[in-house]
Amino acid sequence: MGKISSLPTQLFKCCFCDFLKQVKMPVTSSSHLFYLALCLLAFTSSATAGPETLCGAELVDALQFVCGDRGFYFNKPTGYGSSSRRAPQTGIVDECCFRSCDLRRLEMYCAPLKPTKSARSVRAQRHTDMPKAQKEVHLKNTSRGSAGNKNYRM
């Protein structure tokens, strides 16, 4: 994963803007052509560069950027009932610090999204999540018979 504002990228932006300013002028000198060639070389070298390694704070910052509010794991989450005899687990440091990794690799370490509750489900939850004592009282009151303002338990 490349850095967002790398030196070759900044150099290309600067060179490209300067070149556009110079194009309006009909006179082109060899220094202008050399400057343009240098810019193109910087652009192609940054475009063909492989993914970089991320370690320490840079790795944590990249994970926070990619995962956002979900959070992230340093080891890949495993399923339930995984065997203790399994092979040693590799983590994000092994994959992105000791070797280079890309954006997809970083996303594999993001925590899953937590489902959000809608307003309707919250209202339904209020009714169904009454404390047990209140439910019992409510059930007792509804099970009473009514015979002329006298309440009898059935």
From Swiss-Prot:
Pfam families: Insulin (PF00049). The keyword Signal applies. Residues 120-154 form a propeptide. Residues 79-90 are annotated as: C. It is found in: Secreted. GO terms for molecular function: growth factor activity; hormone activity; insulin-like growth factor receptor binding. Residues 140-154 have a biased composition (Polar residues). InterPro entries: IGF-I, Insulin-like, Insulin-like_growth_factor, Insulin-like_sf, Insulin_CS, Insulin_family. The keyword Disulfide bond applies. Residues 50-78 are annotated as: B. Its main location: secreted. Forms a ternary complex with IGFR1 and ITGAV:ITGB3. Forms a ternary complex with IGFR1 and ITGA6:ITGB4. Forms a ternary complex with IGFBP3 and ALS. This is Insulin-like growth factor 1. It comes from Capra hircus. The lineage of its organism: Eukaryota, Metazoa, Chordata, Craniata, Vertebrata. The gene is IGF1.
